[in-house]
Amino acid sequence: MTLVLHDEGGTGQPILLLHGLMGSSRTWRRQVPWIREFGHVYTFDAAGHGRPAPSELTTEAFVDDLASAVASIEEPMIVIGHSMGALHAWCFGASHPEKVCALVLEDMAPDFRGRTAADWAQMISAWPQPFASEDAMKEFFGPVAGQYFLDSFDRRDDGWYLHGEVSTFRDISEEWGTRHFWDQWKAIDVPTLLIEGEFTITPEGQMREMAERPGTRYVRIADAGHLVHDDQPQRYREVVTEFLQTVS
């Protein structure tokens, strides 16, 4: 049986870390040590990422899968999510409000309607797998994204392979282009930190609009792309630490 919820240690307030699309629980390994200072940390591998995907690739199905995985955690959690993980975090908070006491949401917005993942999926299908070495990964993707994928891909005898189906990743993203998640966001009533990179992938202004909800703080981090916590790890740590000191 594949282990999907990982106990990263620590004591006290449970803190759950949710990775982004095409990521894995391991992409948080550089943040876990300092986040552990604020509570009992758990990481999670989303369905479709190194394990079977739900039969229906809807956000609700992924949230249901997450809820099953964390059912044994009785105390309300601080949930920290990046990208897809951020969306799942606030949708989980909306459908299971008793399980969430605070949110940290990184570079994700409620409404991507009209966007398509078709070209992106075609590009992924053309990646030269397997990647024979760490250097090959970083040369192809760059140092930051290369490390992200090194932490996520399956390593086999002949190199590194994508840890899921391109069609799965495409369809997850395609759903975001057909609907919005403002209603789920408006259902949230816990303290929330919103973090957006200067070179964000989110539609302009949406995360600022999200911050109009009471109890929400918005921070835009300079010189950061979509992987804010890896592009600017020290600044990310500063703003998240400040927030955790107020809620944990």
Protein language model regions, located:
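Conserved HGGG/HGGXW glycine-rich cap/lid loop of the alpha/beta-hydrolase fold
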Residues: D7-R51
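Alpha/beta-hydrolase fold catalytic core
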Residues: M1-I15, R36-H40, E74-P76, C101, ...
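Gly/Ala-rich beta-loop-alpha elbow adjacent to hydrolase catalytic centers
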Residues: G81, G85, A89
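Conserved loop-alpha-helix segment in the C-terminal half of the alpha/beta-hydrolase fold
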Residues: P191-A224, D230
